[in-house]
Amino acid sequence: LCTACMAREPHVVLKGERFTVDIADTQDKQALGLMFRDEMGQDHGMIFLFPAEGMRSFWMKNTRIPLDIFYFDSDLKLVSVSENARPCRTRNCRSYPSTGPAQYVLELNAGKAAELGVQAGDILELHLD
């Protein structure tokens, strides 16, 4: 195992736990998100990077795995979390909105929010370079 290689992998740290992340930093990547994936490692996720804070709303259309959706403001403080967002394969999928302006959105496997014991104000560390 290459420790130096792991250090260079894009990752985030939340409540002391490290998650390797895919980066959604374009509209196309954000629209695709985690659609059509059948599984995701327990220490993996996806980070959505937006140019500024705004009210965010995600849906689970064509997403095959349940997720926790974490919304962070421009200071990387947790604004809100939608726990256990369910997969949706129909036309009318539920939306999961932030409760306040968010600039960063993190998707992890469902159950991580409860496992980590996250609370509003928790800080996300970004290591994307």
Where are the predicted features?
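Bacterial N-terminal signal peptides
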Residues: 1-3
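Compact, glycine-rich, soluble single-domain proteins
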Residues: 5-129
